[in-house]
UniProtKB/Swiss-Prot annotation:
The lktCABD operon has a complex mosaic structure that has been derived by extensive inter- and intraspecies horizontal DNA transfer and intragenic recombination events. Pfam families: HemolysinCabind, RTX, RTX_C. This is Leukotoxin. The keyword Transmembrane helix applies. It is a multi-pass membrane protein. Keywords: Calcium, Cytolysis, Hemolysis, Host cell membrane, Host membrane, Lipoprotein, Membrane, Repeat, Secreted, Toxin, Transmembrane, Transmembrane helix, Virulence. The chain crosses the membrane at residues 230-250, 297-317, 359-379, 381-401. Belongs to the RTX prokaryotic toxin (TC 1.C.11) family. GO terms for cellular component: extracellular region; host cell plasma membrane; membrane. It is found in: Secreted; Host cell membrane. Acylated by LktC. The toxin only becomes active when modified. Pasteurella leukotoxins are exotoxins that attack host leukocytes and especially polymorphonuclear cells, by causing cell rupture. The leukotoxin binds to the host LFA-1 integrin and induces a signaling cascade leading to many biological effects, including tyrosine phosphorylation of the CD18 tail, elevation of the intracellular Ca(2+) and lysis of the host cell. This leukotoxin is a major contributor to the pathogenesis of lung injury in bovine pneumonic pasteurellosis. It also has weak hemolytic activity.
């Protein structure tokens, strides 16, 4: 039993795979049904091999067939065997009564002769030589076959089908197979040649005027002389009615009322009547054959039938309807915004879902019949006619249904196509799919308007310019593929909005965003003195797209994407003080990917920014950037994103504010633009559309170089950066990480940020703030200022001359502890953090221990200042250390210094000077430092467009 179920399952699967492999996208194959083949669609040839011998003296039946054929207008052709064999082999139509060749439909005289000699017929008529009523019977048989073919192949342009090997050719072959099966089964069911000819003729006459086999089941039931017990035409009628209904539904010229009737026939007669008839019919056949019909046998048959019904098929259909329902709900909002594409997609899902449901129901019934008959016929010799009937008919009907299903799918898809074309015709110059992106963008704008209106306050800018990239949309991609309009679709679209004083402005007159040519111009700032340019979502690289749809297989198409790339974005600013965050501008393009989707070869898009006037801030992204700060005080930030450690070398620069920045981005993930493929299915037609989008991709590391001109400050990364300053005034912030900063010449402002940094001011009057971490600070020559705050850690300071100052900006001097440790002065705050001034006492001690030693180095800090401007000089420190016990300054002595009138009298100028210096570097911080004044909106995390992307059903 297990083997039998396995065989049944295998046969069903093979039948399904065979049917599936034959699907294609032709939508015209079932049109113009109802014309008879006799009227000229393609001629019929009665084929007689040249070497086929028959005895005319004995009245061979073939002679009568020839005469009948000539009278009926059927061409009689004698051909060389090898020529016909070649044609038959090439078209796959061999060993049948009927076949297709390049010259027409061949009626094989030898095969017909063999058919007439089969046991039942032969017993009644003896042999071919004794065909009774010769000519009249021959004419009856040929006329019947001719009529059957006229209906089965109605409307098919066989000339074109034979030339192009199109879908119609496959359908024609299936129709011939159906006719062959009918002829075979009639021959197996009758006992005389008269009956055979009569049945063929009756069937042909019944079908003669039936358009597309419409109501064939009812026609067959009216045939006289058919034995339902032997042929089971109650089931055959239902099956053929199902096929006929499918043909009607696929016929684009059929009326709505006809299609409604056909749908009713599918749902009721096929699914209902056939399913009910299966079990009783099978059991009746077993009784007629003298086989068992007991409970266990009935259970066996029922279980076999149930095995043939796949719940997964119906689950898939349910998914289509659920998807359609979700799409309709989703579409309501976008329809109000001027886009009805989601409704079209829902219409397609419902239409094809209905077709799927109908065809699946029929195929389920077919599979159940095949399985049940196999079980019923087990061990029976007399059941072979029934098995022949089922195997010959159900497989052919299933094939026809599958081809009809594809045609019906294409019919639904064509309606979608036509609606899109009609919309574009009524809206000249507009693109339907671009209109879809517009609607998606407007919906996103509505959803985020409250957040956007608050950006002026949150970003502290009079004007906020928000640039939004609407990326690839799966629903739009599905619609483009289904409608065969993939060449018109875009990978996305960029939009720009402006906000001032909490109001939304039209940005088209304020900002030029040209994605095709790579231009972003925000120079028209109007009355706004400050503006923030915010890229809300990753902006794709500039350029134009062109697509071409090509066929890659019998049912496979791909719409190839060609990009005319522009190698850079050109950003222009004007008089306003502007902030640009470029970390969301895609600069890396994944040209080649490995099987895991990791980037193995890349291309880069440069950013060229001319900032104009104003005090500007630029947050650099992942690729090469050229920035000309122009006038004003301009800062370049590397503190956002994870784009590798900096190496800045300005030692050879000849102009102030000019820097070359080299970066190496280590192996990891970075934002890349890549090309992917979207797949949409229309039955067996597969549409692939290439599109570009951005996401974080694994890469093997890369180098990039930035060129900065007229830049006043540079803020580093979270990595271990190296800064080498110029001979001019430099301003560096190390950010996080263990940074090495060398100011070189000039009056530099150097800030270490987090991490154990090494900072050397070099020549010039430098401002040095180690930030958090245990830092090594060297002032070099010049009048240097050092800053330490509570929480900054343990710093070590080395000085080499000049009038230097150390500010404890948030501590009172009287709360500090001053202590001599070896040659060094150690100052400890209330958090027990220490600032060690290296070699403070070394020169004096050398003078005491080395004869005739002359001090040559000044390694002291001349003034140490508290948060309120109180100060103590290096001379006072030396005196109080010498006076105190254990090499420490006495607290009372220190308090007296703090409270000194003269210090208070002169402190104001000192305090004001230091406050300006300290506040000027307050923005020298990484993005996560509490002292950063250029924050990222926290609510940016809620502005992703991904929430708008509709999730397609599996």
């Amino acid at each position: 039993m297990g083997n039998k179920f396995t065989n049944i399952s295998t046969n069903l699967r093979n039948s399904w795979l065979t049917a599936k492999s034959g699907l294609n996208n032709a939508g015209q194959s079932l049109a113009k049904a109802g014309q008879s083949l006799k009227t000229g669609a393609k001629k019929i040839i009665l084929y007689i091999p040249k070497d086929y011998q028959y005895d005319t003296d004995k009245g061979n039946g073939l002679q009568d067939l020839v005469k009948a054929a000539e009278e009926l207008g059927i061409e009689v052709q004698k051909e060389e065997s090898n020529d016909i064999a070649k044609a038959q082999t090439s078209l796959g139509t061999i060993h049948n009564v009927l076949g297709l060749t390049e010259r027409g439909i061949v009626l094989s005289a030898p095969q017909l002769d063999k058919l007439l000699q089969k046991t039942k017929v032969g017993q009644a008529i003896g042999s071919t030589e004794n065909i009774t009523k010769g000519f009249s019977n021959a004419k009856t048989v040929l006329s019947g076959i001719q009529s059957i073919l006229g209906s089965v192949l109605a409307g098919m342009d066989l000339d074109e089908a034979l030339q192009n090997n199109s879908n119609e050719l496959t359908l024609a072959k299936a129709g011939l197979e159906l006719t062959n099966s009918l002829i075979e089964n009639i021959a197996n069911s009758v006992k005389t040649l008269d009956a055979f000819g009569d049945q063929i003729n009756q069937l042909g006459s019944k079908l003669q005027n039936v358009k597309g086999l419409s109501s064939l089941g009812e026609k067959l039931k009216g045939l006289s002389g058919f034995d339902k017990t032997s042929l089971g035409l109650d089931i055959v009628s239902g099956l053929l009615s199902g096929a006929t209904a499918a043909l009607v539904l696929a016929d684009k010229n059929a009326s709505t009322s006809r299609k409604v009737g056909a749908g009713f026939e599918l749902a009721n007669q096929v699914v209902g009547n056939i399913t009910k008839a299966v079990s009783s019919y099978i059991l009746a056949q077993r009784v007629a054959a003298g086989l068992s019909s007991t409970g266990p046998v009935a259970a066996l048959i029922a279980s076999t039938v149930s095995l043939a019904i796949s719940p997964l098929s119906f689950a898939g259909i349910a998914d289509k309807f659920n998807h359609a329902k979700s799409l309709e709900s989703y579409a309501e909002r976008f329809k109000k915004l001027g886009y009805d594409g989601d409704n079209l997609l829902a219409e397609y899902q419902r239409g094809t879902g209905t077709i799927d449901a109908s065809v699946t129901a029929i195929n389920t019934a077919l599979a159940a019949i095949a399985g049940g008959v196999s079980a019923a016929a087990a061990g029976s010799v007399v059941a072979s006619p029934i098995a022949l009937l089922v195997s010959g008919i159900t497989g052919v009907i299933s094939t026809i249904l599958q081809y009809s299903k594809q045609a019906m799918f294409e019919h639904v898809a064509n309606k979608i196509h036509n609606k899109i074309v009609e919309w574009e015709k009524n809206n000249p110059g507009k693109n339907y799919f671009e209109n879809g992106y517009d609607a998606r963008y407007l919906a996103n704008l509505q959803d985020n308007m409250k957040f956007l209106l608050n950006l002026n306050k949150e970003l502290q800018a009079e004007r906020v310019i928000a640039i939004t990239q609407q990326q690839w949309d799966n629903n739009i991609g599905d619609l483009a593929g289904i409608s065969r309009l993939g060449e018109k679709v875009l990978s996305g679209k960029a939009y720009v909005d402006a906000f001032e004083e909490g109001k939304h402005l039209k940005a088209d007159k304020l900002v030029q965003l040209d994605s095709a040519n790579g231009i972003i111009d925000v120079s028209n700032s109007g009355k706004a003195k400050t503006q923030h340019i915010l890229f809300r979502t990753p902006l794709l690289t500039p350029g134009t797209e062109k697509r071409e749809r090509v066929q890659t297989g019998k049912y496979e198409y791909i719409t190839k994407l060609n990009i005319n790339r522009v190698d850079s974005w050109k950003i222009t600013d004007g008089e306003a003080s502007s902030t640009f965050d470029l970390t969301n501008v895609v600069q890396r393009i994944g040209i080649e990917l490995d099987n895991a989707g990791n980037v193995t070869k890349t291309k880069e898009t440069k950013i060229i920014a001319k900032l104009g006037e104003g005090d500007d801030n630029v947050f650099v992204g992942s690729g090469t950037t050229e920035i000309d700060g122009g006038e004003g005080y301009d800062r370049v930030h590397y503190s956002r994103g994870n784009y590798g450690a900096l190496t800045i070398d300005a030692t050879k620069e000849t102009e102030q504010g000019s820097y070359t920045v080299n970066r190496f981005v280590e192996t990891g993930k970075a934002l890349h633009e890549v090309t992917s493929t979207h797949t949409a299915l229309v039955g067996s037609r597969e549409e692939k559309i290439e599109y570009r989008h951005s996401n974080n991709r694994q890469h093997a590391g890369y180098y990039t170089k930035d060129t900065l001109t007229s830049i006043e400050e540079i803020i580093g990364t979270s990595h271990n950066d190296i800064f080498k300053g110029s001979q001019f005034n430099d301003a560096f912030n190390g950010g996080d990480g263990v940074d090495t900063i060398d100011g070189n010449g000039g009056n530099d402002r150097l800030f270490g940020g987090k991490g154990d940094d090494i900072i050397d001011g070099g020549d010039g009057d430098d401002f040095i703030d180690g930030g958090k971490g245990n830092d090594l600070l060297h002032g070099g020559r010049g009048d240097d200022i050092f800053v330490h705050r509570q929480g900054d850690g343990n710093d070590s300071i080395t000085e080499a001359g000049g009038h230097d100052r150390l500010s404890f900006s948030d501590s009172n001097l009287k709360d500090l502890t001053f202590e001599k440790v070896n040659h060094h002065l150690v100052i400890t705050n209330t958090k027990q953090e220490k600032v060690t001034i290296q070699n403070w006492f070394r020169e004096e001690e050398f003078a005491k221990t080395v004869k005739n030693y002359v001090a040559t180095r000044d390694e002291k800090i001349e003034e140490i200042i508290g948060q309120n401007g109180e100060r103590i000089t290096s001379k006072q420190v030396d005196e109080l250390i010498a006076k105190g016990k254990d090499n420490k300054i006495d607290k009372n002595d220190l308090a007296n210094v703090v409270n000194s009138y003269e210090l208070l009298k002169n402190s104001r100028n000192v305090t004001n000077s230091l406050d300006k210096l300290i506040s000027s570097v307050s923005s020298f911080t990484s993005s996560n430092d509490s002292r950063n004044v250029l924050a990222t909106p926290t609510s940016m995390l809620d502005t992703s467009l991904s929430s708008l992307q509709f999730a397609r059903a599996a």
